Amino acid sequence: MKHSKSVFLLLLLMASQQLPAQELQAKVTVNTTRVSNNVNKSAFQTLQSALISFLNNRKWTGDTYAQNEKIQCNLMLNLESTDELNVYTGSIIIQAARPVFNSAYLSPIVNYKDDNVRIKYQEFQQLEFNENRVTGNDPLSSNLTALFAYYAYMIIGFDALSFAPHGGDAYFQKAQNIVNNAPSGSNISGWKAFDGIRNRYWLAENILNTR
């Protein structure tokens, strides 16, 4: 009986070691130095943890990544208060690097700043994202997850592109799908061609259609 139990535990351990890792190893920092002191700052610690979980625990692709192949990325969300309850504007800085084969070095693949951030977040709010229904029930709340899902796909796309021409197209198309179905209204910007020449629309459009 003990022998059977030991064999079972060994097989379970071997199986767990073979499970595919998620694609991203993301660190998220939520900077609230420009948020009003009247706001409960503990909510942003909760948000930071929720965003890390959202990026790292979700399976973004059907590909298999070994633990040492995960894409290292840092996202800094800089927020400031608005006149609306639980609504914030600001920017996000996205940096990512991939491991260099057979070395301990990382090769940078993304360094980008997005100044078109407008989100709604209430502490302990569930971060829900459905790529078939990007807009969700509340545009501003959905804009938060749409924003991070978009950059998750862009990061994965640039990683794949670094290995082969057009290697990231499938993921850039996922990002473009978010653009095409993004939340709108409530002063949300960055998803439309007319929102400026440097935004999420043009980033996806240019990488897919100008090569």
Where on the chain are the PLM-derived regions?
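Signal peptide-directed extracytoplasmic domains
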Residues: 85-123
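Bacterial Sec-dependent N-terminal signal peptides
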Residues: 1-24
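Internal, conserved structured core segments that host functional sites
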Residues: 108-180
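Residues in well-ordered beta-strands of folded domains
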Residues: 29, 76-78, 93-95, 120, ...
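Flexible, glycine-rich surface segments
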Residues: 156, 163-211
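Structured catalytic/translocation cores of nucleotide/phosphate-coupled proteins
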Residues: 21-32, 42, 140-148, 158-159, ...
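Start-of-domain marker
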Residues: 22-89, 100-102
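Short, charged low-complexity intrinsically disordered segments located at boundaries
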Residues: 76-88, 122-124, 179-189
